[in-house]
């Protein structure tokens, strides 16, 4: 059978599947789905997304409303684009909308069966969630790791200082990635995995970057489940390769720790997150294996590192484009910390303007423009609309953060908008949702909070900056690229000048 015949057969099968699965046909004409653009046969509204779904979906939501239907392939999606409706989904009816959609790539190595973000809400998920919230990422545990994280901040400072002496152009995103990865790794297992002075190509770096790229690739299997077994784009195979390598690396780390505990039990204990996971694993009631620990480390590692580094790159970009805002942030740091000192986690409560800057970065540049999609396990009703079982629910953070009824001049970067209110990003204010809300909210907020303040503070407290040669503020590319997180399409590069 030639390729054209294969395409015809697949299209006919997909069309039949599409017609059979259409909820409006299954439920009859009385089923009132949310409004949305008319879907084409088979492909639905896929071609209306373009390469910037955050912008195209937000534009569609302005036309069709805060509860909108989109058909992507054979999958019905409902997009939530207002704070009020987000509260309905994430808080009031979160028990109905708590199941997560699992992308095909994340089923590699059965990762979804262990991963806290994808586990169904049940006893195991509750135990893991409690472990994260009350033990691993609790303030006392994080306070205990301050000193080793501060060493990573000092490494960043020394790299920037050396670059300032030689006039070296710094790739801000790359420097932020190295530091955020190290801040995460020392918190997890007391080990530094990246170094500023090493070659660009290392096994760990290649694996980490490969995994984030694989996880962010659009996959037709997620839109057309009927072709999922064939993995026609190789997305799952690529994910399996990099995820497998990362699991092998974590396997070595776990086994080395266990060996140390057997030979030198007194000195082997680091009181880091790996120790906590091993303690949890020893209690048979918790139903966790050593293999599960490796998968948990993957979630924590990827979630914390990539989100923090991309947010920092956006933050430094906005500060360099707004010298008045940068000057205010630097003045606050000088008054609170003093000159020739590094920002420390203990300084965070005394930096209200920095807090406003970070909130505004979250608002204007949410690295997760859509929260991880939910999947309905039963037919339900929302805002008077019928939502059938199997529907994916997207919370459109990008649109909510640009709601003109809440945010005057929503496209402008204005940290001052947060100085006279108590709006926060920890899940209680549905106008600002960088980490989500409710029972499925990201558990890593306490660690990310500390990482962002200390890293952004280090970039700007002791250094002034100028753009790389040939680049002026007017030429800075502010386009975003869509992937596992939303990142700058063109990396920010600048030269540090010791202040």
From Swiss-Prot:
Subcellular location: Plastid, Chloroplast membrane
Membrane topology, from the record: Single-pass membrane protein
Pathway annotation: Secondary metabolite biosynthesis; terpenoid biosynthesis
Organism domain of life: Eukaryota
Keyword Mitochondrion: no
Keyword vocabulary terms for this entry: Chloroplast, Heme, Iron, Membrane, Metal-binding, Monooxygenase, Oxidoreductase, Plastid, Transmembrane, Transmembrane helix
A GO biological-process term: terpenoid biosynthetic process
Family: Belongs to the cytochrome P450 family.
Protein name from the UniProt record: Labd-13Z-ene-9,15,16-triol synthase, chloroplastic
Organism of this sequence: Vitex agnus-castus
Lineage, opening ranks: Eukaryota, Viridiplantae, Streptophyta, Embryophyta, Tracheophyta
